[in-house]
């Protein structure tokens, strides 16, 4: 077969004409300095603030300080294999985490990667971690209750869907327990829960996950964990990752409860990063923008208006105080951002009042409008009664001869404290709460010995399940307070068969 010169030249010409150079241009830089989870990079002149950069071993970093001659990058992973002179390239992406139904029931790190040993997560959608909070006109006032199942909270400091309610107290006062109980009580409430563990021991997180699993709460919960052994950047971004996962559900019209446990450790991690990035320190060595650190996070909790589906994110941030000092920098910041606080006191905790909620210093600024009518009516005077009891209690220590009125007040106060006590991981449905608080405020418990109050409540709840179902259903379905006669007949009937202990 003869080869024609014309065919060869035509073939070469077409090849040359159709040739396309697939040259990719990547912006790269060089590591100048590395240590303590921070890298200084020379180059990367066009990098964006908050952009992800990739090191030679695949570890990602987050561009934080954009300076004239270098870029300060916080490293989101192990940095032992990164050394001076290594190449770093831009990714053109800002930080995103996987979101969606696939995340439910899983334990993930702040990057959305599974750490529970149950295989990969096949999420199809991602969302940027840093996002502007929902605007004013897209929101709606808080008007739906979020029941925690804890009598002292639902009666005295009620929480509404879309609210930010701070849980604050010293170490070992039951802050995490209050939050976990609130998650357990969302069973069958059509609420997705997200538990963000920041800077906690792995063993503690494991115990909490097991608690949720045993109660069947992991079926509607996502756990985001940045443990104490993780680098500071992961502790810093963990809450933002959690709320990003929650926003996906909120914008789809669902209700979300998110717990940040705790933001004190996040602030400490951010302080560490800022000092290593050589940003000027302020009060208590925190950087100047530590208020914005928490405000931009907590403002993302919202109740959307009906046009946007009416979804909500309710946030329960936790802050740990030192020796009850709520006037420190971070506690005062978060108190001013949130819509109220639940103050847990170690004195109460160690005297056996658990949950150790100090009713005088705890407040809910918007939850009152979300409280169901029945609870609002029966618990109306409860806070005042408790406050006057605490006052009288301190006076009663000095004198033994008390007048009848004072003695009655003290006796009612003792019973109030007993009724508001509650076991761990034992949330109580709101209709049962209304029942026992009605019995308390209307004087039905005045003749029951104080040591019998908890047993009375327990037996009364069991009795009501089978003998006062109509009453319970009416409270549950309408939210209104049934006729007092119905309560009277139920409580009186139960008291006939109740065995008081010998005083």
Swiss-Prot record:
Q: Where in the cell is it found?
A: Cell membrane
An example of a Gene Ontology cellular component annotation for this protein is: proton-transporting ATP synthase complex
What is this enzyme's catalytic activity, as reactions? Answer: ATP + H2O + 4 H(+)(in) = ADP + phosphate + 5 H(+)(out)
Q: Which InterPro entries match?
A: ATP_synth_asu-like_sf (IPR023366), ATP_synth_asu_C (IPR000793), ATP_synth_asu_C_sf (IPR038376), ATP_synth_F1_a_nt-bd_dom (IPR033732), ATP_synth_F1_asu (IPR005294), ATPase_a/bsu_AS (IPR020003), ATPase_F1/V1/A1_a/bsu_N (IPR004100), ATPase_F1/V1/A1_a/bsu_N_sf (IPR036121)
A single Pfam family it belongs to is ATP-synt_ab_N
EC number, as in UniProt = 7.1.2.2
Provide the membrane topology annotation.
Answer: Peripheral membrane protein
Q: What is the predominant subcellular site recorded for this chain?
A: membrane
The superkingdom listed in its UniProt entry is Bacteria
Going by the UniProt record, its keywords in alphabetical order are: ATP synthesis, ATP-binding, Cell membrane, CF(1), Hydrogen ion transport, Ion transport, Membrane, Nucleotide-binding, Translocase, Transport
Binding sites annotated in the UniProt record for ATP? 169-176
Subunit? F-type ATPases have 2 components, CF(1) - the catalytic core - and CF(0) - the membrane proton channel. CF(1) has five subunits: alpha(3), beta(3), gamma(1), delta(1), epsilon(1). CF(0) has three main subunits: a(1), b(2) and c(9-12). The alpha and beta chains form an alternating ring which encloses part of the gamma chain. CF(1) is attached to CF(0) by a central stalk formed by the gamma and epsilon chains, while a peripheral stalk is formed by the delta and b chains.
**Which family is it part of?**
Belongs to the ATPase alpha/beta chains family.
What this protein is reported to do is described as: Produces ATP from ADP in the presence of a proton gradient across the membrane. The alpha chain is a regulatory subunit.
Q: Which HAMAP family match?
A: ATP_synth_alpha_bact
Protein's UniProt name: ATP synthase subunit alpha
- The scientific name of the source species is Staphylococcus epidermidis (strain ATCC 35984 / DSM 28319 / BCRC 17069 / CCUG 31568 / BM 3577 / RP62A)
